[in-house]
């Protein structure tokens, strides 16, 4: 079955990239991931509005200059990260048998799930809800008790910019995102 992505000009896109078999690879290789994004920014024009890196998946909101390029942006990040992690630590790659089975059954291989989730954001309220969801994600998954304690997200930049109070994330703050579940 072919998958067709929707491209709405001048929009933001919430993207979730997951590792193959949800292996914990991103935090251990955070500098390689940062480099992958920097390398991709040399070839494509986009802004990362919000991001949260978890051990097995990444949430980000992109604002690409050309909305039709967000798939290429993600492909470039995945390629750069896979290449560099493979150079540093090839044991992150699956065995050849796992690759054959994964590719045959789900057309997946390497470090990432083949597809990524994407949702086009159409208004400011929705953008704010998605930003909140992304920043609350480490608490949702039980990695920390307070949003401010997770250092692998853009939350701290949002605090600096006065979007959030540094103690944001209590039950009243997250009321609007309770029904959002993108995973």
What label would you give each PLM region?
Residues 1-183:
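Short catalytic/metal-binding and nucleic-acid-binding patches
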